[in-house]
């Protein structure tokens, strides 16, 4: 995926997000994606190469490394970023589905018919539920990966010395040393902190979305000026019925022209 495609996706996500969603997207892109791309490979690229153990037993170093690092940190963070950003794409797909449905409706019934959606990107109906479930899915993914990161490495700290005990083919207890542990510890805390900020922003957006829906429901029954949703639905239904009658030949598509010719039969319509 090139930068233009990524920019287009991020622009689409930003367009249909709330204020909290836009801040969340900025944090993800600046403090997680860019930092991951720029610094992760340099910090964690040599983790297995410079993992030294005080033994010459063949295969012992690899076994100790696999015992302490069952999965690489950078690969775990890459999976986390992929799974966290995927729910936002579902919102874009839902909006695209609405726009395509609206286009087919206008093409079939004409431009005079009422619209199916006043605004395809407005979070009402099914799109609201899609957006809500996307936020819940983000929270689940964030908490799940933080739990995995804390469980697999026994906390977020990065020790300088790890010991392999009773791990074949290593003899007895083997001491192993991690390369650049302080730098890796700082980087780990930074990524965990960015993930925690994203969790707080997602919870705020979730509360905002629910409160906004409740307030809109409370004010829904109040009388408002202008055209009501029921009148729009009535116009859409009338338009569809008229369209079907025209196709069946039961209604003249231009009744005004017939009246004109009945009053002046010698006139030629222009």
UniProtKB/Swiss-Prot annotation:
GO terms for biological process: cell-cell signaling; placenta development. Its main location: membrane. Residues 1-20, 99-126, 211-270 are cytoplasmic. Residues 41-75, 150-187 are extracellular. The chain crosses the membrane at residues 21-40, 76-98, 127-149, 188-210. It is linked to Erythrokeratodermia variabilis et progressiva 1: A form of erythrokeratodermia variabilis et progressiva, a genodermatosis characterized by the coexistence of two independent skin lesions: transient erythema and hyperkeratosis that is usually localized but occasionally occurs in its generalized form. Clinical presentation varies significantly within a family and from one family to another. Palmoplantar keratoderma is present in around 50% of cases. A connexon is composed of a hexamer of connexins. Interacts with CNST. One gap junction consists of a cluster of closely packed pairs of transmembrane channels, the connexons, through which materials of low MW diffuse from one cell to a neighboring cell. Belongs to the connexin family. Beta-type (group I) subfamily. This is Gap junction beta-3 protein. The lineage of its organism: Eukaryota, Metazoa, Chordata, Craniata, Vertebrata.
